[in-house]
Swiss-Prot record:
The gene is CAM1. GO terms for cellular component: cytoplasm; plasma membrane. This is Calmodulin-1. Ca(2+) 1 binds at residues 21, 23, 25, 27, 32. This protein has four functional calcium-binding sites. Residues 8-43, 44-79, 81-116, 117-149 form the EF-hand domain. Signal peptide: none annotated. Ca(2+) 3 binds at residues 94, 96, 98, 105. Ca(2+) 4 binds at residues 130, 132, 134, 136, 141. It comes from Arabidopsis thaliana (Mouse-ear cress). Its main location: cytoplasm.
Length: 149
């Protein structure tokens, strides 16, 4: 996972990590993790932090070493990338930029992609993704359906 990071990213993470490794023993406490991540432009919730800590702190000693931290950051960066890609994809479908994908917009994009769909197929795709039943797909619904793939 961490091997997907650039040298530049690694040194940026090392710098941030070192700032919070007060005693220089190569470990930061789980409490400090949130502060480090926020300094790197991530904005994890308390619940996310707890999940990350449980995931990373393999020996359960309450501290995170730099290799563990790198793996964690690599994973977060990957998640952030795919979130950006999803937003971009949603914008492509949402032709009028009103925050919703209508049946007409879905049909238009699918046709441009070479997918000739019947009205029934388009309606079925909308129904599948349309959690709140308003006949169109909002961003949350779009993310849910895309992440399920």
């Amino acid at each position: 996972m961490a091997d997907q990071l650039t040298d530049e990213q690694i040194s940026e993470f090392k710098e941030a990590f070192s700032l919070f490794d007060k005693d220089g023993d190569g470990c930061i406490t789980t409490k400090e993790l949130g502060t480090v991540m926020r300094s790197l432009g991530q904005n994890p919730t308390e619940a996310e932090l707890q999940d990350m800590i449980n995931e990373v702190d393999a020996d359960g000693n309450g501290t995170i070493d730099f290799p563990e931290f790198l793996n964690l950051m690599a994973k977060k960066m990957k998640d952030t990338d795919s979130e950006e890609e999803l937003k971009e994809a949603f914008r492509v479908f949402d032709k009028d930029q009103n925050g919703f994908i209508s049946a007409a917009e879905l049909r238009h994009v699918m046709t441009n992609l070479g997918e000739k769909l019947t009205d029934e197929e388009v309606e079925e795709m909308i129904r599948e993704a349309d959690v709140d039943g308003d006949g169109q797909i909002n961003y949350e619904e779009f993310v849910k359906i895309m992440m399920a793939k």
